[in-house]
Design a protein with these regions (language model features):
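A structural signal for multi-pass alpha-helical bundles of membrane permease subunits
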Residues: 1-199
Length: 199
């Protein structure tokens, strides 16, 4: 039980402290059609090997799942910190009243950490278009270009490769404005529905 806990914590927290280059290298190694562990498992269960990074249909799934894995550690630390602020007397009183563990989680833990959840949601919505070009460029190849060419990579190529600095700056500014508008809208909705907001 202790080993499983440490193993889970390691694979959850470690990606948050590893560079994007290393994460991308691990993803490429895990998903390799010939030597990747994922395709070895597919072959073991009698399924056909999949070229995840060569097939445009799989690129978005790979990018999102690797991003979730990479960000889980940071989110876990934030939520654990929020849970540590839950009043233990509430749990003790609920236990005396006969509340089950699930009921204590639902009626004590979740309502207590709702403000933290709302703040994280607002911050994530504010950066919803900021995909980050580093990992996409590292995972990108000519075969998955139709799925992997996003605003961030477009700005990078136009600005640094094509030397169209003004155009790249305009596109980047447009992306920032959209993010700011979304942030303001979600913050206003949060302030109207509850007492939690960024400002």
């Amino acid at each position: 039980d202790g080993f499983f806990k440490k193993f889970t914590q390691t694979i959850t927290y470690a990606p948050n402290f590893i560079s994007v280059v290393v994460i991308s290298g691990m993803v490429i190694a895990f998903l390799s059609p010939s030597t990747g562990i994922i395709n070895h498992l597919l072959s073991f269960f009698g399924m056909e090997r999949i070229s995840f990074l060569e097939d445009p249909r799989w690129f978005k799934t790979v990018y999102v799942l690797s991003g979730v894995w990479q960000g889980t550690g940071w989110g876990s630390v934030i939520y654990l910190a929020a849970l540590s602020g839950v009043d233990t007397q509430l749990h003790e009183a609920a236990t005396i009243d006969g509340a089950t563990r699930l009921q204590r989680m639902w009626y004590i833990n979740i309502p207590t950490i709702v403000p933290t959840m709302v703040i994280l949601l607002i911050m994530n919505v504010g950066s919803i278009m900021a995909t980050g070009y580093e990992k996409i460029l590292l995972l990108q190849n000519p075969l998955n270009m139709e799925s992997s060419n996003v605003i961030a990579t477009f700005v990078y190529k136009q600005g640094l490769l094509e030397a169209q600095y003004s155009f790249a700056a305009a596109v980047g500014l447009f992306e920032s404005v959209i993010n700011a508008i979304l942030l303001i809208i979600v913050n206003k909705i949060s302030r109207k529905l509850g007492d939690t907001s960024l400002w």
